[in-house]
Structure formats: C-alpha cells, structure tokens
Amino acid sequence: MARKCEICNKGVVAGVQYSHSHRQSKRTWAPNIKKVKAIVKGTPKTVHVCTRCLRSGKVQRAI
C-alpha cells in the first residue's frame, strides 16, 4: 500500500515515542490511506487518498 496521499502529499512522519519512565524509542506515524476509485481529469482512476481528504470532499468518487 502506498504511504503517501496523492491529493495533499501527506506522508509518513518519524519521531520519538516516550514511555512512562521516559525511555525513548524511534517510531513512525503513517497517515490513514485508502485505495479509492475517483474521477481524475474526467476518467475514473484508482488513487491512494488519506481519509482527511475523503471526508473534506477533495476527491470526487467514481461510482
């Protein structure tokens, strides 16, 4: 599965997670990406889109 939204280019972010005792471990946070059939330039196409773009209506879904 793709790890980047094709609409807003939201991708994986790296950082540090802290435990209760304040020990650090590196980890990544990935966006919630869905594979959706959408209308792109008048034709239906399968694109990888984050759920934020789906909810906000930035993607016109193909039926």
Curated annotation (Swiss-Prot):
One of its GO terms (molecular function) is structural constituent of ribosome. It comes from the Bacteria. Coiled coil: none annotated. One of its GO terms (cellular component) is ribosome. One of its GO terms (biological process) is translation. The keyword Ribosomal protein applies. Keywords: Ribonucleoprotein, Ribosomal protein. Belongs to the bacterial ribosomal protein bL28 family. NCBIfam families: L28 (TIGR00009). This is Large ribosomal subunit protein bL28.
